[in-house]
Amino acid sequence: MLFIESAFLVLTSLSAAEAATPFEGGVKQKVFHSAGHIDDFIVSRDQQTIYIASINRITSLHSSNLSIQNEVSIGPVQDSPWCSADGKSCLKDNRPFSTDVHTKILQILPSGQLLQCGSVKLGSCSTFNSKLSLITEASTPVAANSPDASTVSQIIDNRLVVAASPTKESPGCNPNLPGLNVENAGDLEGEAAVYLRAAYRSSFRFVTTFSHQHFIFVVATVTPRETRLPVTTRLIRFCKNDTKFVSYSEIELQCRGEDNTNYPFLTAVVQTGDKLIASFSASPTSSKNSICVFSMQKVKLTFWYNVDRCRSGTDSIKLSHIGRDTKCVNKAHIPLDEDSCELGVGGSIELVEMSTIDVLAKVTSLMAVDQKALFAGTSSSQIVMLKWDEQNSNKLEEYGRKEIGDGRTGSEVVKMTRFGDFILVQMPYGIVMEELSTCAHHESCTDCQVSVDPLCQWCHPTQSCTTSSRCSGPLTTQCPIVDGDPIPSMVSVNSSTSISFNIHHLPPPVGFVYKCYFGSKSHSKSTKATWTASGISCPSEMFGSPKTFEISLMTSISKNPISRHNFTVFDCAGYSTCSTCMSSEFGCQWCSHKCSSSCGSASAKACVKIQPMKVPIAIGSQQEIVLEALNLDTLDRKTEHFCKVNGQVAPAKIASDSIRCGKIQLAGSNETNANMVVPLSLMANDVVVDIANVSLYSCSNLAADCSSCLALSPSLSCGWCNRKCSHECHESKATAVCDPPKIDRFEPSSGPVEGGTVIKVYGNDLGMSVEDVRGKIYVAGSRCNIVEYQVSNMIACQVDKGVSSGPIKISVGRATMAVAESSDLFSFVRVSIFSAYPLYGPISGGTRITLYGQNLSSGSRISVTVGGLPCPIERINSSTVLTCLTPSGSSIGKSAKVVVHVDHSQIQLDQPFEYRSDPSVNSIFPLSSFKAGGRIVSVQGSSFNTVQSARMFLISSPTPPFEIISDLAPCHIINSTLMTCMTPKILETITRRVEYTRQPVGFLMDNVTAVANLGRRIQMSVYPNPSLSPFKGIRYHQGEQSLILEGHNLNLAAEPNDFKIFVGSERCYVTLVDVRQLVCSGPLKQPKPTDERGVPINGDNPLVTVIVGSLRMELGLIEYSDHALPSRLSFLILGLLLFTVITLIVMCLIFKRRRQEREKEYRKIQLQMENLENNVRKECKQAFAELQTNLVLSPKSTGTITSPELIHFPHFVENLLWADQNLTSAPSLARTLPVTLAQFHALLSFKGFIFTIVEAAESDVSISTSEKSTLASLLISVLLRNFSYCTEIVVDLLKAHIARSVQAKRAELLFRNSDSVVEKMFSKWMSICLYSHLTPQMNSYFYLYKALQYQTDKGPVDAVTGDARYTINEAKLLRESVETKTLKIHIVPFEKCDETTHLEVHACDAICQLKQKVASAVYKETPYSQRPRITQFELKLKCAKRGDIKLTDVSAVETLSQKKLPVKLLTLADYGIQDGATLEMTSAVYTAESYRNSLADSGQSSWSSLDRCSPIYSSSKYYHLTNPSSGTMTFKKRTSPSEIPKSIPEVYLTRLLTSKGTVETYVEDFLESVLYMHDSSYPPILKFFFDILDREASINGVSENICQQWKANGYVLRMWTNFVKNPQLVFDVPHSVSMDANLSTVAQTMMDCFSFSEPVLGAHSPSSRLLFAKDVARLRPLSVDLFKRVKNSPPLGMEELRTELVNMANDVSTCKGSSLALSELLSWVRGNGIRISQLLSSNQETSQQRLPQKLSQVLHVCLETDNHIYSTISDYD
């Protein structure tokens, strides 16, 4: 990797020219195809040229149309990674060869020149001018020297920064080639660099680099050398002016899902504004990516936290890959701000963010747009468009997708760059220019403002929807609102005026002017408008003729109008009479016998106005016409006036208020009309005074029969004569004789017997008035009362009850009556209801209920009620079936009566209707479809079976108001919780122009409104329709091969099972769906020539049809290739057959030879299998014998167990508090004045100060668990001086901790993880309090320990791994058949020949094990800590023939350098030691030879470790009993099938049972003692502890079960488990790996006894739980009983508690080390002083006690000056 930073000699401005729009809209996509793979591209600063670097070539394109400007070839060149840049110096026999040039760096220099660095010549660079002519060519290595290596670069402040990861070590350059190197623009000389160690170079892959504020950042992914470790994403940072990279720092970036799943693989990253946006995936091949947004402020703070953590002396620098991993120095008193550049670390605090959105695609690049949108390029030729959520600025939501490129460009979106209102997209073999937004598709301001595209805004000057960069004026946030029509909206011809538009939110003209256009813009005149705050005003043009046209308001640079209105130009001269002139809508005036828009002189104040006629005139009559008129006094009586009607003229006589015209013959033009109107003009000479309309009528057209004629108004003078109605009849109406009445028809024909039916009777001459027929109508003998009457031809009446059928009889007339009788009969019937379905429905109503009955179509009125509410009838299918829609119900489960009303009949259904719960929708899967719909989706919810049908649709908005934008798709209800639906089709009129939308879903389920709009909760993604390319001619296909179909958008919203492909009428089953490809497996033989329905088609070939959803696509005809081979291939086949025969003969010979070899190998394997069987049989027999004989310890061995002696209490406290630390000396104590310690100790007397220390540690997430444990030990050690005060502090802290845990809903985790300072303090305090009361339990534990030790030593123990034949831990079970025997040897201790010790050992024991046993046997009466270490003596074998032989683990003759690893440790059998041999102990003498023999070559002392029974031998270098390269399957991975293991590891599991049976009694005794089964009293502190937990559980409302978990965790998990796993705390015994394994099993068993959950045991359960499962089942109830006994025991009195605390105070007074602990605690407080001071100041109580000031006095005491804070950082010049 290489970081380069260099100052240019000639500083030039780096400001880019303002982006120019390359071309106007209208072109959706432009593509440049490259012959070679494109490495990178960049745009020139003037935005006119695009430079593209492909393999061996650089090309410049015109930005307007992507046409080629210039092109230059840069490769291939003669190069080799094993040669120098000039190729003159190569390593050994290497020579330069033809090598392709891959461009790694492509940058525009400040001078405008093009910088290109390739993968050849060690990554050197060249510069080109704008015409791609070579300017300079340097040899300095800059870029990565491999095509596959990563290189990122940027130019910042005239400096080039490069990060590169070379993959080839080249001797031709500096072997310490930095990963980053910045060159001067002229000579490319590097200035500063930081290096990666060679071991780490291949781990880093650089993704991008960017700058923010005064920092430079590089994003890299790190793949650990160990495959078990996860891939991480590192953010590297250093200051811009940091030439020595002192500020070089790293943090880890993590992106996690909602379930806290970590997505480790970074796929793309981009930085914009104050956000760092990155895309991650769960695996490199995952098709789902999660996008996380990191705040740059959080990035800065995370770097600062890590730097500050190192500043306080915590942890190390952790930059081992660049050679910086020293320990951090504590300099907390030195200030450090967030922008500091004086320290760099690779801290352990990572930056974690949760995923903001999941993208269902493999994201390969990201691009941010104006901090409004984010574009994600994918590997499948798509750009996913995302926008920031309006409610949450850190949340993203998808609003569209774009297909990019074509088949020739490749499918992966490598890089995206904004280019004006377009995107430049780099694909593997092409550059694509695509529109940035969809704004051009929105034509109105309102549509633009509500667009889902966040980049779209309304540009007022151009009146178009566009992006902000394309608008020359201000963007509109509020659309203009036009208030009414323009004023005026009409003008007179030949006049001009100012027209005003009342428009709100109209911005003032800036950079443009407003114009008014009269008529269409292409054929219109325009005038400049004047803008005011209230609107716009325009002067109008002169118009010469009346017309109506459109007036538009536009801007001078717009093509679209702001508003359009109809505008009228009128001409008053068109009105010929005074009255029409004065009454016109245009305000015309009558001036001097003509109409004008305005009068120069006084206009007429009144006009003659003829009033409409009140009485019409009969057509064909000749009579005078009298008309009323107004303002007749204005007429000149001397002038002759006359009337003119239909061309006939008659003189007119003018009265004061009327006009009488002479007789005129009035003839109608069309006598078929009953009424007509003709104009009548009053003339004065040739001048028309006024015009009135005269109404004419025709009697024959007004009445067709006698009764109607005689019923006409007497004023019409119509009479009946000559069988017609006429005004010429001279007979009176009284003497007229009419025809008899007649009934033509009636309806309905039947009705209920209860009556009430309204019958309408139609006929002729049914009376002249209602009185002629009132009370004279009978229907089948029942009276019928009139409800409606029309003269002569219609009577409506309501019939009374009836029981039979009969005609309708009507008597017409008063004096003399005529009777009319119908020919058809009316029937009285009985209406009945048999059943109804369904009889249940949702509470919201709308259920379509069908009623079945008889005579349901009878009667005139029918209605249905459900529960007393109307059930609107939908339709009546017949006399037996009707349907209605139920109303909403009042309550769920209520039964409602169903009643049918037919006129006066009322019928109730026997079964009631039941209202049930409304259906609800919970989820839909899948939530994606295409525009044509028809995809099957599953809908889950509840109460679906309460409705009979459901239909699915999409709506425009999740909130009202909204509209349905799709058709209604049917659903199939399967049960109450599941139904399947077809996705709906988007309506063509509503089809959005964007290719992708997310629309809310709604369902039509009766009248249930809750599912009509599911809102934002459930939205369906609508994608473009999948399309398939038709065949070009007939498609030829091999039947046995899969059929591959090409198309677009195939898998966006469809799965393989959504496609139905037919070849003819046979199915072709889909096996794979890609975005552009569909693969199916079809019939092997060619089907019949049909379509998918089996309909025959023309020709011999079947039709290929694809059905997906509602889409049906015919792709064309397909023809299967003929299976008969063509004749021209016969010779080829013959040759192939001959070649096959020869090949078979050769193969047979080879097979015969191989068969002989396999038989030999088989016999060998058979022999190995027999050996394996013998070994297994032998092991089983031995295991059976051990199980039957070794069930208890022998009496002899039992007698060897000595009485236990607990270590003294001070030593126990020291072991408990400082088991993992060494507090024997503290450098800080020597530097700390006693007065300072006294002042600090005084501070500890304030509870608030201690509580603040604990709070500071608990709230600091950077403090590790081990640091918290150390802090707890320091506090306990210091507080032990006053044990009562210590107890009070611990109890108060515990109470507060319990309350916080309950409040945080973590009550069940109390004492479980012990990651809290409070819990650690409490466990240590509890152990100290109970130590003196644990003598019975410790006795049982000691016997158990000795029993386990004896059982383990009975068999072989591996000195390297600690595996033992006899153990109760499966992990440390020796899975080998080790042949050994017991030897009795004699030991002469240290030249005491007269005293010998007898010892039993194993012949397989290593020498270090023998020494340990010798020391234990000789010094068995001496405590272990006082015995000599095995490094202090040697053993010599007394041999008369060979002399004394010194025993060592490794022979002095064979060293590590001479032996093949691993080396076997020597055993007693290797030295030939026999039974009865004598060994002598001698003092160890350290010489060079003995040092070498002691395995010092391994880098560490083996003997000191073995002295503690802790094998330190590396299993890769040494082995004892188990050789890693041979043996069982556990230790060896077979390299060939012929290798058979010597035995099966699982056979040895029976040894666990042997060991368990031996020590089972001791385990039970120990567990029973912990449970106090044999004791009636308990330690007072235990009762005190349990009572505290009971009280706090009651106060905080915690259940009894959780409280018991607290007790079990505190008593067993935190105290007893610590004792069991660490016997060195209480006994003076050695440490042993094999014993640790045994004790871990005992500890696990003890925890299981106190577990409250019943474990589920099986074959896969851990052996530690299976071994003692029965014991655990017996003892678990006793643990609950223990808690009950303690709880029910008498409460602990204050006096008893005080006595106990006094005794404890006396015990702890003998403990030492509190001064050292006080000094270390002061050092910790000093390192966290700022945080503690802030907490003290924020607390009112501690502030009143002046604790912040007191602490400040202590912290400001001067200490000796340490080294410089950055002394651990190595600078690289």
Swiss-Prot record:
Recorded topology in the membrane: Single-pass type I membrane protein
Positions annotated as glycosylated: N65, N241, N494, N566, N670, N693, N855, N877, N975, N1007
Keyword NADP: no
Residues covered by the IPT/TIG domain: 741-829, 831-916, 919-1006
Bridged cysteine pairs (disulfide): C83-C90, C117-C125, C239-C341, C255-C292, C310-C328, C439-C456, C445-C479, C448-C465, C459-C471, C516-C538
Record keywords: Cell membrane, Coiled coil, Developmental protein, Differentiation, Disulfide bond, Glycoprotein, Membrane, Neurogenesis, Receptor, Repeat, Signal, Transmembrane, Transmembrane helix
Residue ranges that the UniProt entry lists as topological domain Cytoplasmic: 1152-1764
Coiled coil: 1150-1188
Ranges in the topological domain labelled Extracellular: 20-1130
Domain Sema, residue spans: 20-436
Transmembrane segments: 1131-1151
The keyword Signal belongs to this UniProt entry's keyword annotation: yes
Gene Ontology BP, a term: sensory neuron axon guidance
GO cellular component: plasma membrane; semaphorin receptor complex
Positions of the PSI domain: 438-480, 571-608, 698-739
Signal peptide: 1-19
One of the record's GO molecular function terms: semaphorin receptor activity
Location in the cell: Cell membrane
Role according to the record: Involved as a receptor for mab-20/sema-2a in the formation or stabilization of cell-cell contacts at several stages of epithelial morphogenesis. In early embryonic development, required for proper ventral closure of the epidermis. During male tail morphogenesis, involved in precursor cell sorting and in the formation of distinct sensory rays. Involved in axon guidance of SDQL neurons during neurogenesis.
Family per record: Belongs to the plexin family.
Quaternary structure and interacting proteins, as annotated: Interacts with mab-20.
Protein name per UniProt: Plexin-2
Source organism (scientific name): Caenorhabditis briggsae
